[in-house]
Amino acid sequence: MRTPLKIVLVGLPGSGKTTFGKALAKQLNFAFIDLDQVIEQETGNTISQIFEQEGEGRFRELESIYLKKVLEGIEGFILSTGGGTPCFNDNMELINEKGVSVYLDVSLEEIIRRLGKDAFGKRPMFTNLGDGEAILKLKNLLAARENYYMQAKIKLSGDDISTEQLLSELMVFFRN
């Protein structure tokens, strides 16, 4: 079995990209890379600081720069992207050109359950929003982003499924 060398996870915030990515990286003995962490390390600012001080437009620009840098660098990794990464600056096209994209498709209800009330406020896109506003924003994000996510080479349903089951499903794709 030849496993693709660059696996890129896409999906909404709370879809499990980081959790699943770390488990997959461990199973495949690959590096795990979180794009947000790369941006923070390279810029010396948190994602929240970039949003607050420079705006979302600048963040998306940085996101594209570092996505390209990661995808053109090492091989043998699992990359967890930000929820909006595929939707800007031809990023999804680049992801599909340089790696194997995997969309973790999780229902809004499950994402809301996973994130809980407190986690929304820790994410820049949801800062200063009440629960109802955060849920509405999440629904709007899915509507705006789903077309990009659906361009992924592999789609996995992440509702009511364990990380181990997701890993098994993904390995079936690689064997075929």
Where are these regions (language model features)?
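Hydrophobic anchor at the beta1->P-loop junction of P-loop NTPases
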Residues: L9
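ATP-dependent small-molecule kinase phosphotransfer cores
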Residues: L35-N96, K117
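ATP-binding Walker
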Residues: S15
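NTP-dependent small-molecule kinase module
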Residues: R2-T3, Q27, A143-N176
